[in-house]
Amino acid sequence: MSTAVRIASTKKPAKYALIFLHGLGDTGQGWSFLAQYLQQYHPCFESTNFIFPNAPIKPVTANGGMPMPSWFDIKVWDWTTSNVDTVGFQQSLKEVQKYVDSSISDGIEPQNIIVGGFSQGAALALASAVTLNNKIGAFIGLSGFAYLRNELQETRKNLNPNTPVFHGHGESDDVVPFPIGVQTAEFFKSAGELENYTFKSYRGLGHSADPAELNDLAEFLKSNVYSKDA
């Protein structure tokens, strides 16, 4: 597996695991604040192991070939193109599976595992909803997009059709435009046949997250994954 920033549960034993994938050019450290944010939001999150994997360093074609942390190559700044890094995307999906398997090996029940991500990481997290070999607790996609749509439809696994999905997107996003977020949600609800899919938009929010979105995310997780402890 790739390296990761890990923040152990403050309440033992750990009962939950949240695996969160960062965006292009970032690292796991960039999203590690989410652990403290959720732990301070409600005590139910104190029994969570937080895992923030680091993407490998690789050249990104759309950035002039500059090496940077990236889960897969982005060849052009077009979120609907079929000209994508299929191999890199599928390799990163396998990494997600490894982190899920590792959490299960650590004693976390699959229904208490959450897979999420931001931007490039959200593309992987949402795709994991139709590719994982396990039925888990929830999926999170913040400012994400849908890559490899045809391939995902052809290889879709029907293990998480009712698993809760939280998908948030800023209406002022200038990196992954808001209409792409809407199209992504429609794709996963229709072609992906994900029946328990929550899509929320945030006025004035760009390509980032804000307290309104994070609070909605926390409430979503409390209701759908942590309900017996919240």
UniProtKB/Swiss-Prot annotation:
- Which source organism does the UniProt entry give? Candida glabrata (strain ATCC 2001 / BCRC 20586 / JCM 3761 / NBRC 0622 / NRRL Y-65 / CBS 138) (Yeast)
Q: What is this protein called?
A: Acyl-protein thioesterase 1
Q: Which terms in the Gene Ontology molecular function aspect does this entry carry?
A: carboxylic ester hydrolase activity; palmitoyl-(protein) hydrolase activity
Q: What is the lineage of its organism?
A: Eukaryota, Fungi, Dikarya, Ascomycota, Saccharomycotina
Q: Does the keyword Hydrolase apply?
A: yes
* Protein keywords: Cytoplasm, Fatty acid metabolism, Hydrolase, Lipid metabolism, Nucleus, Serine esterase
* The protein's Enzyme Commission number: 3.1.2.-, 3.1.2.22
Q: Which InterPro entries match?
A: AB_hydrolase_fold, LYPA1-2/EST-like, PLipase/COase/thioEstase
Keyword Membrane attributed:
no
